Amino acid sequence: MADTLMSDIPFWQSKTLDDMTDAEWESLCDGCGQCCLHKLMDEDTDEIYFTNVACRQLNIKTCQCRNYERRFEYEPDCIKLTRDNLPTFEWLPMTCAYRLLAEGKGLPGWHPLLTGSKAAMHGERISVRHIAVKESEVRDWQDHILNKPSWAD
């Protein structure tokens, strides 16, 4: 009987991030695409500025990588979020499942693991679908900073 009750609890509520399988870990990603937007770092302060400039591999409409399995071949600077380096990614969005679970919080109601699709996430405008621009169309990345510092006004 106890095994039956345990199996009714979603893995993200019954396991720590460290105890999850690779498949479970990957499924936590909601596919919002926010990790796939380029960031700029201030050389003097190390402050990170977010842009709406999408990586060349990001399909903006679907918010999915065109070459996920081989992404590091195409984009050597692509991030790889792991259990070990998760604490170093302080810039992860407040809506990120990895961040939320690491902070002891639950998944948001729109998360694809709860809803079965990305539709609610897109509807809540969590994904970059509505803001991202193609890297090839950008001339000055500073014009695309979302969290502009005072000096950029």
Swiss-Prot record:
InterPro entries for this protein: Puta_zinc/iron-chelating_dom, UCP006173
Coiled-coil segments: none
Family classification: Belongs to the UPF0260 family.
HAMAP family: UPF0260
Protein name, per record: UPF0260 protein CKO_01185
Organism: Citrobacter koseri (strain ATCC BAA-895 / CDC 4225-83 / SGSC4696)
